[in-house]
């Protein structure tokens, strides 16, 4: 893997193409399973697929950054099922479709660390200490990285799965706790030195920091032509 490692800043820059006007424009990346008006919306060179477009239907031709829903794969999925939610792993085929898109078009998939989707789809869990390792499917690479290094107020340990792209050296290992800057109603929680994630809303927890988003887009823009995409 050493031959494909690059500095993170170089990876974030990605590849560009020349537009008709002679100006460089970023290579188009399809952002799958993203929020309307969220981090990937209205960006040059990004084709966002929100819930209304149904990213399971994506048929190319661009490399992808995929954020498939994680609720049915997280540690609390069983508890949620006991209270009426769908069964663990029953995500309507979203993860499987995202995995297929990354394998066919190249790119990177993001999920919370310890996601049960890895085992369910035959992928090897990456070491929490960081570093890219083979995913065990003869196709992709996987790693663990904390988004706290990239501006998320929580640590937010994350697993990535990448195919056909350059693999940048990321900020490996534990990230420092970030101070929580919520309203005064949370002052007693700050005084008690509680983790930010414990007082964050769901929307705050799942947001992708701009620096991490740009890193993923930069990786996808290095995607090489995939044999199955012909």
What residue ranges belong to the model's regions?
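Compositionally biased, low-complexity flexible segments
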Residues: 1-16
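Class I S-adenosyl-L-methionine
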Residues: 15-230
């Amino acid at each position: 893997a050493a031959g494909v490692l690059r500095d993170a800043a170089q990876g974030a820059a990605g590849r560009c193409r020349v537009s008709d006007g002679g100006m460089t424009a970023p290579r188009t990346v399809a952002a799958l399973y993203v929020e309307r008006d969220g981090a990937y919306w209205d960006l040059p060179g990004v084709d966002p697929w929100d819930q209304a477009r149904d990213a399971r239907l994506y048929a190319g031709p661009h490399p992808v950054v995929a954020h498939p829903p994680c609720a049915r794969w997280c540690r609390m999925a069983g508890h949620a099922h006991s209270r009426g939610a769908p069964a663990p792993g029953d995500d309507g085929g979203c993860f499987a479709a995202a995995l297929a898109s990354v394998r066919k078009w190249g790119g990177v998939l993001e999920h919370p660390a310890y996601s049960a989707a890895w085992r369910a789809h035959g992928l090897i869990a990456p070491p929490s200490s960081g570093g890219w390792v083979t995913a065990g499917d003869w196709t992709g690479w996987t790693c663990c990285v904390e988004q706290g290094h990239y501006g998320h107020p929580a640590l937010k340990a994350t697993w990535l799965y990448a195919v056909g792209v350059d693999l940048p050296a990321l900020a490996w290992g534990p990230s420092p706790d970030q101070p929580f800057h919520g309203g005064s109603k949370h002052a007693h929680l700050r005084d008690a030195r509680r983790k930010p994630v414990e007082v964050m809303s769901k929307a705050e927890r799942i947001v992708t920091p701009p620096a991490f988003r740009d890193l993923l887009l930069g990786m996808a823009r290095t995607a090489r032509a995939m044999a199955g995409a012909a």
